């Protein structure tokens, strides 16, 4: 009997333990941008990097990155919403907030039209920033005129991300020798999933 009481009390404590944790709702309201999922541009608050142990010096870097921030995959992902708001606007069915949203949406559409899936200016800045931080953190690797082999998938936003990264490195050290290539040859190891729908 005593064992049952101990087990029951233990089970109750375990069940109640999560109640003190932060809820998803609280976290979403604290940082609503996180609710964007893959559309949330990663934050720029970077923790300091761990120093190499004594006696060790960087001599090589292998970097595997994903494309920077992009526009939605296709214009249709914007257009259906623009059309919906336009129809409601013409029917005088929008509230003041709806009209404000419609005007903002038209500005977004003006910028985004024709850029479906492309790298955004923010995406370019992100990759330039990664290159800059890498260069500042490991200057020994970039001294002189080392050779850099840069490879990308055939998806344009990925190739443009690679070039933004490499261009920033070249600005920091014009003597770098960078070989760029985006081809089918590297698709198997750079992106093993089907990319034909992009």
Residue ranges and their predicted role:
Residues 54-58, 143, 158:
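Extracellular/periplasmic catalytic domains that process cell-envelope and extracellular macromolecules
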Residues 23-117, 129-130:
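N-terminal regions that are enriched for targeting/export leaders
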Residues 73-78, 161-166, 175:
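Short, solvent-exposed loop/turn and secondary-structure capping segments
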Residues 1-23:
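Bacterial Sec-dependent N-terminal signal peptides
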Residues 62-65, 148-153, 179-182:
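Extended hydrophobic secondary-structure segments that form protein cores and membrane-embedded regions
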Residues 113-137, 150-154, 165:
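Loop-to-helix element that buttresses phosphate recognition and phosphoryl-transfer chemistry
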Residues 71, 84, 130-141, 165-168, ...:
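Structured segments of extracytoplasmic/periplasmic soluble domains
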Residues 196-197:
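Conserved small/polar residues in nucleotide/adenosyl-binding loops
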